């Protein structure tokens, strides 16, 4: 694992010493930014996972079967993106993957509510592919910040991600009931713009 490069073993009194790459204050700040990125990612992903089929049926009048096939295409894209995010981060750096995956999805998410059926499918595939590649990079970046708390970091980020997705599904469902399903995607389309906070993430130098 990449984060093991930051672990220094010292044979003093039989103890293992682990060096943090940043000060405690900068580490907390960086983790807060990463959680903000998880927040934006999983709100938008929840809108697609939970309501994409209803959106297609309502806006384009497609059948239930067709809408489910379109959802399957989106889910395939998310699987590919998730698998690709880690190796790409190893090659070009976690921060660059986070930049590209969160903020890079913004043009697609902003455009999707304003195009026809075919382009909606194409853009949703692009969003799924790009946005899903963020989580492996975010998780590994966080583990590099706290290499001696890998279990804590994994639990925190997975728990926060699932929690945000669950709450977002309920909130977005209520929004759809009051303002219409199209309003959900008009609003959620702006969520990837929170990727701009990646600017404040420090660069972790390889040792």
Locations of regions flagged by a protein language model:
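Extracytoplasmic gate region of multi-pass secondary transporters
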Residues: 27-82
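C-terminal membrane-cytosol helix-exit motif in multi-pass small-molecule transporters
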Residues: 1-13, 198-203
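Small-residue-rich segments within alpha-helical transmembrane domains of MFS-like 12-TM solute carriers
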Residues: 42, 46, 128-136
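Structural signature of the two symmetry-related core transmembrane helices
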Residues: 96-111, 189
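Intracellular juxtamembrane helix-capping segments at the cytosolic ends
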Residues: 133-146
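A late C-terminal transmembrane helix in Major Facilitator Superfamily
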Residues: 143-181, 185-188
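Helix-to-loop junctions at the C-terminal end of transmembrane segments
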Residues: 81-93, 176-177
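Paired small-residue
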Residues: 118-127
């Amino acid at each position: 694992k990449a984060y093991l490069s930051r672990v220094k073993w010292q044979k003093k009194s039989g103890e293992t010493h682990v060096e943090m790459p940043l000060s405690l204050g900068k580490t907390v700040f960086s983790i807060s930014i990463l959680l903000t990125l998880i927040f934006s990612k999983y709100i938008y992903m929840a809108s697609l996972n939970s309501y994409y089929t209803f959106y297609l049926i309502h806006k384009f009048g497609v059948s239930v079967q067709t809408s489910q096939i379109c959802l399957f295409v989106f889910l395939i894209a998310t699987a590919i993106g998730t698998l690709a995010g880690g190796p790409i981060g190893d090659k070009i750096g976690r921060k660059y993957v986070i930049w590209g995956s969160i903020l890079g999805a913004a043009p697609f998410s902003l455009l999707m509510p304003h195009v026809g059926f075919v382009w909606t499918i194409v853009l949703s595939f692009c969003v799924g592919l790009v946005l899903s590649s963020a989580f492996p990079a975010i998780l590994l970046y966080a583990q590099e910040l706290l290499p001696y708390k890998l279990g804590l970091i994994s639990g925190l980020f997975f728990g926060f991600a699932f929690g945000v997705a669950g709450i977002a599904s309920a909130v977005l469902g209520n929004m759809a009931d009051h303002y219409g399903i199209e309003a959900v995607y008009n609003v959620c389309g702006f969520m990837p713009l929170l990727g701009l906070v990646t600017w404040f993430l420090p660069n972790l130098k390889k040792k």
